[in-house]
Amino acid sequence: MRHYEIILLIHPDQSEQVPAMLERYKGLITAGGGKVHRVEDWGRRQLAYQINKLSKAHYLCVNIEAEQTVMGELEHAFKFNDAVLRHLTVQKKKAETGPSSMMKTVEREEARKAQQAEYAANNS
């Protein structure tokens, strides 16, 4: 089996359906004998350029281990799901289970904001 990293850009109006969509894709992967190593929900973010007249999208990052037949089914599901604006699949050499650089950036930003709030509360 091969390791893959999949990035999904989902229509911002469909953000509530992201967990159900993710479960459906996980079901496809596990039914084909694959494994899901990491799922990161990056949330709603600004796009670099407009896609279908939209300037924001809901981002998901999924690291999986699966056969090529399962990947074909997933690609087919992505293409025919109107909520998926774009998808990118990259083959990896090994399974990635730690936080991605995007999540590390988000965690650093949250820690910085918490530290500023604590500093402001102490100096008031």
Curated annotation (Swiss-Prot):
State the Gene3D superfamilies in the record.
3.30.70.60
Region entry Disordered: which residue ranges? 93-124
- Kindly state a single biological-process term from the GO annotations of this entry: translation
Q: Would you tell me the Gene Ontology cellular component terms? A: cytosolic small ribosomal subunit
Per its UniProt record, what CDD domains does this chain match? bS6
Do you know which SUPFAM superfamilies this protein is assigned to?
A: Ribosomal protein S6 (SSF54995)
* Molecular function terms from GO: small ribosomal subunit rRNA binding; structural constituent of ribosome
PROSITE patterns in the cross-refs: RIBOSOMAL_S6
Pfam families from the UniProt entry: Ribosomal_S6
Kindly give the InterPro entries that the UniProt entry links to this protein: Ribosomal_bS6, Ribosomal_bS6_CS, Ribosomal_bS6_sf, Ribosomal_S6_plastid/chlpt, Transl_elong_EF1B/ribsomal_bS6
Which keywords does this Swiss-Prot/TrEMBL entry list?
Ribonucleoprotein, Ribosomal protein, RNA-binding, rRNA-binding
**Could you tell me where the Basic and acidic residues compositional bias lies?**
105-115
Q: What does this protein do?
A: Binds together with bS18 to 16S ribosomal RNA.
* UniProt xrefs under PANTHER family: MITOCHONDRIAL 28S RIBOSOMAL PROTEIN S6, SMALL RIBOSOMAL SUBUNIT PROTEIN BS6M
The UniProt family comment states: Belongs to the bacterial ribosomal protein bS6 family.
Q: What is the recorded name of this protein? A: Small ribosomal subunit protein bS6
